[in-house]
Each structure stands twice: as C-alpha cells, then as structure tokens.
C-alpha cells in the first residue's frame, strides 16, 4: 500500500468513526386528534409517524399551513350545517365568497349550507355575524346559523351556563340566549310586512301586507303571504286549486327555483311550503335562497308562524316541524317580536386548505 493510499484509508476510517459516534436524530412524532370517534382516536393514538425533515423543509411547511389553512368548527342546527370561523381579529372575512362556495361543496370540500364568521362587534354589539351561502351569495341573516353562532361564541370564550349576546347582522340587532338545557332562544325582532320592504312587487292585500296574494308559478296559481325577517320569505299553504298541501309530496328541486327566481321577488326569495297539523302545530319544507332545499330554516319557521297568524290558520305560539326537527316559535303581541327556540351543536373540528 502506498503512503497516499494509506492516508486516504485513514481519513475515510476516521470519518466513519465520527459518523457512528453522532447520535441519530429522534423521529418527529405527529399527533392527529379526532373528536367524536373513539375507534379513530385509539388508532391515531397508536400511530407515530417518523418524518425526518430538514429545518428548511419544516419551516416551509409551517409557513404554508399558517398562510393557507383555515381552522374551523362544524356546527349544525336541526341539520342546517355551517362551517364556523373565528374571525374576531378582523372585520374582513378570512375566505372569499368563491372560496366559501368551494368549502361548502359536499363532494370536493368540507360540505355545509354556509360559512359563518364571528367578527368584531360594531355599533354597541358584542359581535358581528356574516354568512356566505353555499353558492357564495351573502344573506342578511340565518336563524339556525345564529343559534350555532351563539354556541360557538360560548365555546370560544369558554362560557358556562346561561348567556346572552348582542349580535350585529345584516338584518339588524339579534339577541340569542343560551339556556340551561343547551338550547338557544333568539329574539328575532319584528317581522317586516310592507311589500316594498320585503321586497316583493306583489300588491298589498291586507293593509300594507301581502297576505294570500295570487302568484302564478309553473301553471298554477299559488296563494302566498310575504314576510321579511331581515331576509325575504314567501310562505304558501297551497294553490287555489289545491287548498291543502301535503309537503312530503313536493319535489322541491323542481318548484323551489321557480319561486326563488320569480320576477315578483327582485332580491330573490326563500320559500316555505306549509301543512297545518293543528292551530299550534305546523309542518314545513323550505327552499332557501342561495342554498336550495335544506333540513331547516329558522327565519323561515318564524315567517311561517307570522303568515299562519295573518291568514287565521294558527295561534301565535307554535311548534314548527322541519325535516331536521322541531322549532318552538312565538310571535308576541306585547312587543311584536318573534322568539325562536331550538338546538345547536358542534359536530367536528378541522382545518381546510383554501
């Protein structure tokens, strides 16, 4: 062996010894938390994923996540489901209407009827509530959404027991109260009955209100009563030919859009189809403006009771059955306010790339 070869061999041996003496980096262990599924929690808890990464790669991934990941809580109120976003640090929504529509897609996104943002309060309100529908449009208010909003606030603020909040919405000030049984009672304010303020082009039939007006849709003459709960509603109990509806027989995907986009409703409309079970018990299905057929609509249930009272079909305090479950609605004479009581609950927690 030449002296040069011997020197090279010695250098390689020394480098190998130094490498062997260097402790191996501990594998990173990433924990994924899943709530609501005990089996999944056990499986995930048993996993330890080794992901040796360079410092540069780790920094890139963390930066990317902080810029693109939207953290949310999925809530539902009688099956009307929403992606709830903590937006208290800004008056600008964290996602655009177009991004919200993608998030709401039930095949390519998270899946929801809308995205709701908890934002800083204005004009003396504790919080501001904004909503993007599943089509990206922005409604003034959502009754089921405001119940979810109240429960989400309680979770964010770690509040226990009964609490009420003043919430600024596109429909004005709304005051929900979390009750001891976990349900949320909401002062929905006063109904708007003047046609131009709803808005509708239908002529008034009772004082300034549009009550049992004729509306031609799909070859039939429907009798409708129009109400705004800060957002427009068209309520019908049947046609001139068919006085009593059996709402389960309706194909909403056919008839709903024809009401929503009818020329008599310049801002489009939500439509409620109602079956009277008794003077204190109503059953409805709804086609929501910007969301289509949904399992529940809180403002719609309020509008239904108002319409039923105006048409002499029901009392001021009713249980309203929706596909997702019942709501308790009361239209009080003393203050002309409508009160809605119903459930809202968290479904799961997650993050989505947007």
From Swiss-Prot:
GO cellular component, one term: chloroplast
Pfam family, one: DAP_epimerase
One BP term from GO: lysine biosynthetic process via diaminopimelate
EC number per UniProt: 5.1.1.7
Transit peptide: 1-44
EC class: isomerase
Keyword set includes Chloroplast: yes
Predominant subcellular localization, coarse grouping: plastid
Keywords, in A-Z order: Amino-acid biosynthesis, Chloroplast, Isomerase, Lysine biosynthesis, Plastid, Transit peptide
Name of the protein: Diaminopimelate epimerase, chloroplastic
Species per Swiss-Prot/TrEMBL record: Oryza sativa subsp. japonica (Rice)
Source organism phylogeny: Eukaryota, Viridiplantae, Streptophyta, Embryophyta, Tracheophyta
């Amino acid at each position: 062996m030449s002296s040069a070869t011997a020197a090279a061999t010695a250098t390689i041996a020394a480098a190998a010894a130094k490498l062997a003496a260097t402790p191996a980096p501990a594998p990173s262990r990433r924990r994924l938390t899943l709530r609501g599924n005990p089996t999944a929690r056990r499986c995930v808890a048993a996993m330890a994923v080794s992901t040796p990464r360079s410092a540069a790669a780790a920094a890139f991934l963390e930066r990317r996540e902080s810029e693109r990941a939207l953290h949310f809580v999925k809530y539902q109120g009688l099956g009307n489901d929403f992606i709830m976003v903590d937006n208290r640090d800004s008056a600008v929504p964290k996602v655009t209407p177009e991004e919200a529509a993608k998030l709401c897609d039930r095949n390519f996104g998270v899946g929801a009827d809308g995205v709701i943002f908890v934002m800083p309060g204005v004009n003396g309100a504790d919080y501001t509530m904004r909503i993007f529908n599943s089509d990206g449009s922005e409604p003034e208010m959502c009754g089921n959404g405001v119940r979810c909003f109240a429960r989400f606030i309680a979770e964010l603020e770690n509040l226990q027991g009964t609490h009420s909040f003043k919430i600024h919405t596109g429909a004005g000030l709304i005051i929900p109260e979390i009750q001891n049984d976990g349900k949320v009672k909401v002062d929905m304010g006063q109904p708007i009955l003047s046609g131009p303020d709803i808005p509708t082009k239908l002529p008034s039939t009772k004082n300034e209100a549009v009550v049992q007006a004729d509306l031609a849709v799909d070859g039939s003459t429907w009798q409708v009563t129009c109400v705004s709960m800060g957002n427009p509603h068209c309520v019908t109990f049947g046609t001139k030919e068919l006085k009593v509806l059996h709402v389960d027989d309706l194909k909403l995907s056919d008839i709903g859009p024809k009401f929503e986009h009818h020329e008599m409703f310049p801002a489009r409309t939500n439509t409620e189809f109602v079956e009277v079970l008794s003077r204190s018990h109503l059953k409805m299905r709804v086609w929501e403006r910007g969301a289509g057929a949904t399992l529940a609509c809180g403002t719609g249930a309020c509008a239904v009771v108002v319409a039923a009272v105006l048409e002499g079909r029901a009392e001021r305090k009713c249980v309203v059955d929706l596909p997702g479950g019942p709501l308790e609605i009361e239209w009080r004479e003393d203050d002309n306010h409508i009160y809605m009581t119903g459930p809202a609950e968290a479904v799961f927690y997650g993050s989505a790339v947007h």
